[in-house]
């Protein structure tokens, strides 16, 4: 009896803690995240889970226009824990933090780790699928 209860609690925990994934066509992404040459960025200060503060520039986007798996439009509140995953035409995936992703000329450049600040570039022409989700990491903006 206790074993069944523990299994039930485990399944419910997994179900409610999983991150919901949303989708975004490449065109919708480029409308929301234009090239850096055409937009004024805003300064934010974010606090990481350990309490360290980091100041950086972000696109002035309060909510991200995306779609659920059924194609229903959804607005996801932007924040420092939002992750964006690009799958290219060869099936390779790259995951960045949405607020640390930029479009420069014909490439998407993003930060893969807020701790190490690892950057990677992907040609826009090779992007096949874009997925967005709240990674539920304990990052938060403190100056908004």
Locate the predicted segments by residue.
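Compositionally biased alpha-helical segments
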Residues: 20-144
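Positively charged n-region of N-terminal signal peptides that target proteins for export
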Residues: 1-5
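C-terminal motif of bacterial Sec signal peptides marking the signal peptidase cleavage site
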Residues: 15-18
């Amino acid at each position: 009896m206790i074993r069944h209860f523990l299994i039930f609690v485990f399944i419910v925990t997994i179900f409610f803690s999983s991150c919901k994934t949303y989708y975004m066509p490449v065109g919708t992404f480029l409308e929301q995240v234009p090239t850096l040459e055409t937009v004024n960025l805003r300064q934010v200060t974010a606090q990481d889970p350990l309490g360290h503060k980091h100041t950086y520039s972000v696109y002035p986007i309060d909510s991200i226009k995306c779609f659920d798996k059924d194609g229903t439009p959804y607005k996801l509140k932007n924040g420092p824990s939002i992750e964006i995953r690009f799958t290219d035409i060869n099936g390779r995936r790259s995951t960045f933090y949405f607020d640390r992703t930029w479009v420069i000329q014909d490439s998407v450049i993003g930060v893969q780790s807020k701790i190490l600040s690892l950057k990677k570039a992907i040609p826009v022409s090779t992007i096949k699928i874009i997925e967005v989700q709240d990674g539920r990491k304990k990052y938060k903006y403190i100056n908004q």
